Amino acid sequence: RPPGFTPFRIA
C-alpha cells in the first residue's frame, strides 16, 4: 500500500 492509503474516500 502506498503511504497515506485509505480504504475510505476522504471528501
From Swiss-Prot:
It is found in: Secreted. Keywords: Amphibian defense peptide, Bradykinin receptor impairing toxin, G-protein coupled receptor impairing toxin, Secreted, Toxin. Disulfide bonds: none annotated. Its main location: secreted. It comes from the Eukaryota. Transmembrane segments: none annotated. GO terms for cellular component: extracellular region. GO terms for biological process: defense response. One of its GO terms (molecular function) is toxin activity. Expressed by the skin glands. Belongs to the bradykinin-related peptide family. This is [Thr6]-bradykinin RA-11.
